[in-house]
């Protein structure tokens, strides 16, 4: 945590994010006790990792107010930049790459068929090319159990086993900030910063 970037996010990879206040498109409350909270800018995360066979260096690791995990800013060989979900033990200055038959190294992204069984992975696609959907929150990972024909069998943290196409991509490692579950809110005001308003129990109402 001491190595987290203290400055502003990389501006071209952010966009505005309006608070819904728990309202839907009709202006009706659909999620109670939501509203106010600190203003946030959305960080555009690359869940696809489509810059194949191009090395990227980890430029910095940042806090993201929109998710529980940390995010890493990558600088590619063509000087373009992208944010990715930061895996545990990824350090500033590390090299990562995306593509087929790459080294089994934290932060590298490749199809499941190129990963040995028993490996912990995160940001796993459910449909090839649709971007990572599984295991994206702090401390999350899934285990590659084995293969069945054109399918890979993955075991989720819930204990459920799922089959996905072996061509689907995943990133090696576990998601960072696994201590997030131990955070003590400490005071009501901290929940207000997060946009959570007091929730009245139904039994306490008239």
Identify what each model region corresponds to:
Residues 1-67, 88-206:
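Basic, glycine/proline-rich low-complexity segments that contact nucleic acids
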Residues 66, 74-76:
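Structural recognition of beta-strand segments within beta-rich domains
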Residues 76-79, 157-158:
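Short acidic-glycine loop/turn motifs at beta-strand connectors
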Residues 79-91:
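Beta-strand/loop nucleic-acid-binding surfaces
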């Amino acid at each position: 945590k001491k190595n987290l970037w203290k400055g502003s996010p990389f501006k071209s990879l952010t966009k505005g994010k309006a608070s819904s206040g728990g309202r839907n498109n009709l202006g009706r409350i659909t999620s109670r006790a939501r509203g106010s909270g600190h203003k946030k800018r959305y960080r555009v995360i690359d869940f696809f990792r489509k810059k194949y066979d191009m090395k990227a260096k980890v430029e910095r690791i940042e806090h993201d107010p929109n998710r529980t995990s940390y995010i890493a800013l990558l600088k590619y060989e063509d000087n373009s930049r992208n944010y990715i979900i930061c895996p545990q033990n990824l350090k500033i200055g590390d090299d990562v790459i995306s593509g087929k038959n790459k080294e089994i190294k934290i932060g590298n992204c490749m199809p499941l068929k190129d990963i040995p069984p028993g490996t912990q992975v995160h940001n796993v696609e459910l449909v090839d090319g649709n971007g990572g959907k599984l295991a994206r929150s702090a401390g999350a990972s899934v285990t590659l159990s084995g293969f069945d024909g054109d399918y890979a069998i993955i075991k989720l943290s819930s204990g459920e086993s799922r089959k996905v196409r072996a061509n689907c991509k995943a990133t090696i490692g576990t998601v960072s900030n696994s201590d997030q579950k131990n955070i003590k809110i400490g005071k009501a005001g901290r929940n207000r910063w997060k946009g959570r308003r007091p929730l009245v129990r139904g039994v306490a109402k008239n």
